[in-house]
């Protein structure tokens, strides 16, 4: 294990109040030490590295200038919050990031008063900040509210809805646009910094306020003339922007790694701003760590790594990942069917659609962080006879539910939804768990809902989705590697609404939806050994259900247990509804539904999370024994 970095200045800073005692000339050294601390911590835990390294100076400057936590500081998404955590009383736990019982990898209200708003999904900061700014006005409190949002998050419509509303309300809100991709405009050196300072200073802001007061005094007839004069002055100084059209006073771009640029602007805004202000700051992802600077995409999210070389720890997989199996199967099918297109919302690598883009660049679309648009865009393609695969993580599909209902399901359009990261996802915790997709999709008429039990089943479901044109269809699969089954050369087309029995028994029936099948088979071994002959089936479909299979289980077994890595209201609830409506519960059938517990489960390794939820081998056996009034045999479910 490498030695901890030497951080004499950072050792003096536990909270932002300590930071404010430092001289401006000390801050560059503090930034170097915060970077060293963060690099060392993430090298031991893994996590999001590049984004945090890019905002070290910005984070220090904000905490130096503003009176946090009384002034509210909100980070969008939260990938960049590690320096913030180091400076807000959590440095002693920074090497527990994303570990069980450790610090969250995102901002979290329950963790610190310095996290006024939790985040993990994108583009929420301006809306939340606006709510807090209006609350401060209603309370007649002069606290400032600062929302830090990345240029990537600005691709989502919600950010613009909030900007539009903030401008209309003339809210006292500070938005800092962290442009770490140089995608909007780079700073142009000393002149840019000077103009930004000038634009944020008392003179120009005073003119703007004077214009408002004069308009109020003389009436609206003079408003257009004053507006033209103010806009001319603003455009002359900084260049007119769409943010200004929305009512924001726009400053920048400025160098986000220069305290000489950041501190004067932030102080001017703190002391003079009365309406909404947007500060455009340009930063470099991975700043200060050469491997991350050279390959920002590879160091966005990292495993544990060697600080000296940057080499990340790699565990040799026992089987291909579900994501790679999906990608390979989709490319295979797209080679045979030129109507197949892929859609991703800023996650081409995470969803595997980068492979489709490499093979068929004109048939793969990255729409940015815009899940709502992605789904309706897919609906438009489907309406014209294409076969769109809108590949989204389960947690992000939630963001587009109205589009799934209104634009896809009601119209019966055959949009295909590959749902990645289904179930527990481990270190990213409850904000990224794939908990609810089965529950919210099975409520929709005409929607086919599948889950892959293993990587071979996933390949079958890709081909099934290609062949299915009668309406929308989804298939879910987890993060991580498969179980190591033999793989078909090409997937088979499954019969819609038909499951499969993988082990015959007579007393207990385990009906699995998804990848809990492997644990069901292990549990069946223990139950057989305890004298409880057990049937195991892979449901494949939560909608439509395999009614014949369920009736067979109900009539020929003493007990039925459904098992799924999803929330209450999903597959098990669909089975229960069917059994109830058919009168199959009237003769004493014992039935239990194993689902994710009705809590927000904290980060841990997925296997530990499944064990805690009772969804593993031991939990299934224990549920059977309790339902049958038997004690848990020592060594069977232990």
From Swiss-Prot:
Q: What is annotated about its quaternary structure and interactions?
A: Homodimer.
Answer whether the UniProt record assigns the keyword Transferase to this protein. yes
- Which cofactors does this protein require? Mg(2+); thiamine diphosphate
Q: Give GO BP annotations, semicolon-separated.
A: 1-deoxy-D-xylulose 5-phosphate biosynthetic process; glyceraldehyde-3-phosphate metabolic process; terpenoid biosynthetic process; thiamine biosynthetic process
Entry's Gene Ontology molecular function annotations: 1-deoxy-D-xylulose-5-phosphate synthase activity; magnesium ion binding; thiamine pyrophosphate binding
Chain's role: Catalyzes the acyloin condensation reaction between C atoms 2 and 3 of pyruvate and glyceraldehyde 3-phosphate to yield 1-deoxy-D-xylulose-5-phosphate (DXP).
Q: Which PROSITE patterns match?
A: TRANSKETOLASE_1
What is the organism field in this record?
Rhizobium leguminosarum bv. trifolii (strain WSM2304)
Q: Which domain of life is it from?
A: Bacteria
Arranged from A to Z, the UniProt key words for this protein are: Isoprene biosynthesis, Magnesium, Metal-binding, Thiamine biosynthesis, Thiamine pyrophosphate, Transferase
Query: Which InterPro entries does this entry report, sorted A to Z?
Result: Dxylulose-5-P_synthase (IPR005477), THDP-binding (IPR029061), Transketo_C/PFOR_II (IPR009014), Transketolase-like_Pyr-bd (IPR005475), Transketolase_C (IPR033248), Transketolase_CS (IPR049557)
Known SMART domains for this protein? Transket_pyr
UniProt entry tagged with the keyword rRNA-binding: no
Question: What EC number(s) has UniProt assigned to this enzyme?
Answer: 2.2.1.7
Descriptive protein name: 1-deoxy-D-xylulose-5-phosphate synthase
Q: Quote the record's binding site residues for thiamine diphosphate.
A: 79, 120-122, 152-153, 180, 289, 371
The annotation note on the cofactor reads: Binds 1 Mg(2+) ion per subunit.
The annotated pathway is:
Metabolic intermediate biosynthesis; 1-deoxy-D-xylulose 5-phosphate biosynthesis; 1-deoxy-D-xylulose 5-phosphate from D-glyceraldehyde 3-phosphate and pyruvate: step 1/1
């Amino acid at each position: 294990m490498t030695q901890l970095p030497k951080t004499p200045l950072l050792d003096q800073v536990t909270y932002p109040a300590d930071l404010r005692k430092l001289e401006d000339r000390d801050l560059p050294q503090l930034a170097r030490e915060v970077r060293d601390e963060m690099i060392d911590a993430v090298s031991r835990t893994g996590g999001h590295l590049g984004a945090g390294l890019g905002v070290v100076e910005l984070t220090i400057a904000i905490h130096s200038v503003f009176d946090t936590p009384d002034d509210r500081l909100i980070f969008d998404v939260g990938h960049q919050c590690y320096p913030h955590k180091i400076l807000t009383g959590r440095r002693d736990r920074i090497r527990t990031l994303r570990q069980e019982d450790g610090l969250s990898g995102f901002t979290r209200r329950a963790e610190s008063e310095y996290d006024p708003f939790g985040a993990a999904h994108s583009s929420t900061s301006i809306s939340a900040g606006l709510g807090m700014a209006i609350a401060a006005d209603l309370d007649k409190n002069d606290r400032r509210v600062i929302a830090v949002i990345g240029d990537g998050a600005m691709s989502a419509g919600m950010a613009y809805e909030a900007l539009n509303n903030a401008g209309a309300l003339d809210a006292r809100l500070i938005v800092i646009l962290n442009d770490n991709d140089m995608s909007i405009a780079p700073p142009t050196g000393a002149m840019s910094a000077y103009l930004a300072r000038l634009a944020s200073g008392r003179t120009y802001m005073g003119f703007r306020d004077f214009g408002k007061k004069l308009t109020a005094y003389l009436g609206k007839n003079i408003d257009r003339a004053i507006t033209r004069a103010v806009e001319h002055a603003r455009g002359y100084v900084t260049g007119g922007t769409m943010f200004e059209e929305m009512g924001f006073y726009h400053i920048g771009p400025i160098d986000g790694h220069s305290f000489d640029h950041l501190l004067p602007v932030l102080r001017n805004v703190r002391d003079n701003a009365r309406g909404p202000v947007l500060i455009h700051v340009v930063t470099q992802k991975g700043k200060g760590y050469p491997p991350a600077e050279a390959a920002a995409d590879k160091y966005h999210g990292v495993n544990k790594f060697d600080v000296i070389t940057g080499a990340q720890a790699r565990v040799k997989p026992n089987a291909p990942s579900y994501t790679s199996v999906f990608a390979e199967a989709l490319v295979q099918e797209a080679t045979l069917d030129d109507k197949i297109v892929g859609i991703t919302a800023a996650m081409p690598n995470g969803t595997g659609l980068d492979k489709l883009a490499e093979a068929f660049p004109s048939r793969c679309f990255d729409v940015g962080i815009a899940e709502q648009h992605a789904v309706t865009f897919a609906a438009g393609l489907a309406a014209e006879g294409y076969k769109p695969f809108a590949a989204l993580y389960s947690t992000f599909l939630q963001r587009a539910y109205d589009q799934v209902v209104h634009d896809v399901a009601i119209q019966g359009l055959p949009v295909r939804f590959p749902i990645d990261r289904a179930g527990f996802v481990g270190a990213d915790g409850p904000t990224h768990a794939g908990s609810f997709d089965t529950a919210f999709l099975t409520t929709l008429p005409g929607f086919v809902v599948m889950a892959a039990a293993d990587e071979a089943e996933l390949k079958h479901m890709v081909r099934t989705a290609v062949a299915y044109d009668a309406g929308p269809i989804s298939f879910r699969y987890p993060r991580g590697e498969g179980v190591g089954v033999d793989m078909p050369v090409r997937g088979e087309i499954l019969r819609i609404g038909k499951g499969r029995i993988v082990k015959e028994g007579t007393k207990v029936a385990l009906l699995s939806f998804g990848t809990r099948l492997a644990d069901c088979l292990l549990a069946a071994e223990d139950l057989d050994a305890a004298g409880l002959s057990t049937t195991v089936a892979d449901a494949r479909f939560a909608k439509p259900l395999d009614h014949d299979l369920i009736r067979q289980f109900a009539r020929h077994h003493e007990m039925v247990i459904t098992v799924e890595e999803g929330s209450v209201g999903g597959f098990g609830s669909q089975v229960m509804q069917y059994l109830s409506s058919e009168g199959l519960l009237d003769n004493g059938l014992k039935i239990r539904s194993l689902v994710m517990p009705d809590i927000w489960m904290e980060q841990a390794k997925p296997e530990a999370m499944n064990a805690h939820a009772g969804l593993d081998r031991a939990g299934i056996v224990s549920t059977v024994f309790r339902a049958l009034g038997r004690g848990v045999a020592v060594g069977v479910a232990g």
